[in-house]
């Protein structure tokens, strides 16, 4: 059975692309900084897309500070979490990226601190990036106890919550 993937992980794609759109429309440009959205595939098939990227590009950015934020399943607002550990706790994500996310969440214009957590089951692409030597962390909003849309045919656009 196929899962349409509206929440896992079209919502993550929306967040990444929307961030770029917001920067452009606001006229925000950074000196000596590049912001991009990397959309990897095959996360559900063993993090293959992110893993392939890390293997292909390992060492290319060693002289450039590089941070990766993996947005995954942005549906349940009350469960928005910064994941400092991944792959059911087996992989430690970057404390630097977690600190940057904390700083952004605590900014007076945002003022919405997020809890830290461990990906309770499975993994996000941040695990592959962290294992591959990149500084990465994940942000997701999914009820860990009840997600009737998760990994099944019910993960359709009508299950998305745009406010999240």
Role assignments for model-derived ranges:
Residues 1-93, 122-126:
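Acidic/histidine-rich catalytic neighborhood of metal-dependent amide-processing enzymes
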Residues 74-164:
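Active-site-adjacent substrate-binding region
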């Amino acid at each position: 059975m196929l899962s349409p993937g509206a929440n896992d992980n079209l919502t993550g794609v929306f967040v990444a692309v929307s961030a770029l759109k917001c920067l452009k429309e606001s006229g925000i440009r950074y000196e000596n900084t590049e912001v991009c959205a990397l959309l990897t595939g095959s996360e559900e098939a063993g993090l293959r897309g992110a893993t392939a990227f890390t293997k292909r590009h390992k060492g290319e950015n060693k002289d450039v500070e590089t941070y990766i934020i993996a947005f995954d399943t942005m549906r349940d607002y009350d469960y928005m979490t910064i994941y400092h550990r991944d792959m059911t706790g087996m992989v430690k994500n970057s404390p630097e990226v977690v600190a940057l996310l904390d700083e952004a969440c605590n900014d007076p214009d945002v003022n919405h601190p997020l809890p830290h957590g461990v990906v309770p089951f499975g993994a996000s692409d941040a695990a592959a990036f962290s294992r591959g030597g990149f500084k990465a962390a994940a942000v997701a909003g999914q009820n860990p106890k009840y997600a009737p849309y998760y990994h099944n045919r019910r993960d359709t656009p009508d299950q998305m919550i745009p406010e999240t």
